[in-house]
Amino acid sequence: MPRRPSTGTQSDTPALHVVPSFYGVYLLQSEPKPSSFYIGSTPDPPRRLRQHNGDLKAGGAYRTKRAGFRPWRMLLVVYDFPSKVSALQFEHSFQHCHETRHIKQEERISKNKLSGRTLHHKVANVALLLRSSYFRHLPLKVLVFEEAVYNSFMNNKFVTCSHVDLLNTNFNEYFSVMEKDLDSTVDSWKTRHTNENEIWSMAKEAVILGSPRCALCLEPIEQVPETSSPISKRSDLQRYLQSESLPLVTMCYNPQCRDVFHLSCLGHRFTNSDGFQSLIPATVNRCCSCNAKLEWRTLAKIATKLRYYVLKDSLQLPSQVLENDDNYESQNVNDS
């Protein structure tokens, strides 16, 4: 039977990737049944936990709705994924630690689908994934909300937990949106978004409203699309982006610098510095102008957000193009 012609399905919808402000993979534990765990991913952990516990009617997951398992508590969140796709890759690997390609067979502590049900196993598997050849190149961090989980990392029963970027905190305090007299250097949900809003305002002023040149190649930067034709297909958008008519542009977010760069120019400089060549930039680099420390993830976030800001109206892109939904339902609950 011949294939039916495309009717503009979701897979054909043009979508621009934007590095999310927050995307994490979380581990839940049932309070009535402590040996039952659930693994999922979300851009909004407080909202997601309320869905799992039935406080919100919409959302949640079938497996966490079963009688006798609620309430659930969130034990940890692995976060700072550069995309929803990379978060789902980590989530799937976390759910299938006994067979994932991201943990070497000789290093696996979960030997089959039914093994690895203790908290020590969960913590050790997180650490194994974080040091894998793929995920270690992402600047991933771990939030821990329970003392027992933190102690498990510290005890390091399976000798896997070295070099984990760990923050031991309180779930409600970290994700609080209430005004608090917090030190601006404290890592929290509120200060994180406040800092990002300030950086975004600087970026728009420097790149969109100004007439900058790349501080490396000295070429002028024009953030104006060369076409106003609406784009209705993903393939059309890909062809437009590959034409390099609107390159990714970023900015040093040191307020005393604010120099503008092509992301490709920075990437080339960061991967060919000090006579050493690497495949990808380090997670933290130095500004070529002011020598301030810059996170590559933040530079990429600025660049993708600027591109979306410029293109979304000019090319009449659909409004829902960001990777920020959490409708994916995990299929992994370990029951006692």
From Swiss-Prot:
Q: Which gene encodes it?
A: SLX1
Q: In its UniProt entry, what is this protein called?
A: Structure-specific endonuclease subunit SLX1
* ZnF (SLX1-type) intervals: 214-290
PANTHER family from the xrefs?
Answer: STRUCTURE-SPECIFIC ENDONUCLEASE SUBUNIT SLX1 (PTHR20208:SF10)
What keywords appear on the UniProt entry? DNA damage, DNA recombination, DNA repair, Endonuclease, Hydrolase, Metal-binding, Nuclease, Nucleus, Zinc, Zinc-finger
Q: Which InterPro entries match?
A: GIY-YIG_endonuc, GIY-YIG_endonuc_sf, Slx1, SLX1_C, SLX1_endonuclease, Znf_RING/FYVE/PHD
One term under GO cellular component: Slx1-Slx4 complex
Similarity remark: Belongs to the SLX1 family.
Top-level EC class as recorded in UniProt? hydrolase
Q: Where is the GIY-YIG domain?
A: 21-104
User: Where is the protein found, in the record's own terms?
Assistant: Nucleus
Q: Which metal ions or organic cofactors does this protein require, according to UniProt?
A: a divalent metal cation
**The EC number(s) this enzyme carries:** 3.1.-.-
